[in-house]
């Protein structure tokens, strides 16, 4: 597996004879020799950065690379901060669960949904319970009847391996 390299080609590392050159926030110099573009960058006290090395001719920009890199890092940090992380809470049930236990687990599920978290209900089938998986579906449907006013069923009760699963999302 190859990693993408973020190596930036700039200043003396640019090995092409001519580039299409732009000055950061100003005019375009057009197609000039790499040496001429480097001289112009040195006059301005900035860096010559190769932006599009695959273009014909390659595109270079005269800019303050340190400032540019700092702004890019801040943008990435801001995007990461604004990402929404979905919290999925799992509630385990059994086929032989008592009514009081269901009420207790439903109370917790309601709290999770009120906080905006997703809830995954799982009924584990043991031993002979595997012979009648519909009983697990009945338990999930009983739970659904208790929480349908605060949640939206994302996935219907579904049999997966030894579990019957149901996903519930908070109402909007």
Curated annotation (Swiss-Prot):
Protein name: Translation initiation factor IF-3
GO molecular function, one term: translation initiation factor activity
Reported function: IF-3 binds to the 30S ribosomal subunit and shifts the equilibrium between 70S ribosomes and their 50S and 30S subunits in favor of the free subunits, thus enhancing the availability of 30S subunits on which protein synthesis initiation begins.
Known partners and oligomeric status: Monomer.
Similarity field: Belongs to the IF-3 family.
Keyword Lipid metabolism attributed: no
Entry keyword annotation includes Cytoplasm: yes
Subcellular compartments: Cytoplasm
Superkingdom as given in the UniProt entry: Bacteria
GO biological process, alphabetically ordered: ribosome disassembly
Keywords: Cytoplasm, Initiation factor, Protein biosynthesis
GO cellular component: cytosol; membrane
A Pfam family hit: IF3_N
Gene transcribed to yield this protein: infC
InterPro entries: T_IF-3_C_sf (IPR036788), T_IF-3_N_sf (IPR036787), Translation_initiation_fac3_CS (IPR019813), Translation_initiation_fac_3 (IPR001288), Translation_initiation_fac_3_C (IPR019815), Translation_initiation_fac_3_N (IPR019814)
